[in-house]
């Protein structure tokens, strides 16, 4: 039920993926591991920033305390969705490149492990998108949600370069 914990679990999964790529002992796997580490640093940092922004406004990280944030903070919803999609490996983002290279590298040496990794990626995407849906969608009925402040110019200025770096 804690947004920060969910993102932290995602980080652990991504580092496991980096390890698998490194131990594939292929050029693709090693390159994918390095790319995934850099990408993960940007994306996870941005996701923790997203949690910090809503925590600063509501003083809770509990998923159940949110819902309907999209109606009140549309710019935030865009950036949070982009970071979530980059985290799950949306094509066109740095998350995709690293994950694809690791999968190609591990497929060359251990195809069965690559199948398990691909399954793990799908399950990871499911729980990250579940988190996004629970926090962002629904009807903004709670007074705390309805009164949330939109992103400030300073916060948008922070998000824009991070978003640009996550694109390939």
PLM region spans:
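Hydrophobic face of alpha-helices
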Residues: 31, 35, 47, 129, ...
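Hydrophobic alpha-helical membrane segments of integral membrane proteins
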Residues: 1-12, 31-38
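Transmembrane alpha-helical segments of integral membrane proteins
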Residues: 128-143
């Amino acid at each position: 039920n804690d947004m920060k914990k969910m993102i932290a679990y995602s980080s652990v999964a991504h580092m496991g993926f980096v390890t698998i790529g490194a131990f594939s002992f292929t050029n693709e796997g090693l390159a994918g591991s390095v790319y995934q580490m850099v990408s993960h640093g940007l994306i996870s940092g941005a996701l923790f920033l997203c949690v910090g922004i809503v925590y600063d406004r509501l003083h809770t990280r509990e998923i159940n305390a949110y819902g309907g944030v999209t109606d009140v903070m549309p710019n935030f919803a865009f950036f949070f969705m982009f970071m979530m999609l980059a985290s799950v490996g949306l094509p066109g983002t740095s998350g995709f490149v690293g994950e694809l290279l690791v999968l190609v590298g591990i497929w060359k040496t251990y195809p069965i492990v690559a199948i398990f990794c691909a399954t793990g990626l799908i399950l990871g995407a499911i729980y990250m998108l579940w988190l996004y849906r629970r926090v962002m969608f629904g009807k903004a009925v709670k007074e705390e949600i309805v009164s949330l402040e939109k992103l400030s110019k300073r916060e948008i200025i922070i998000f824009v370069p991070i978003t640009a770096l996550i694109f390939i």
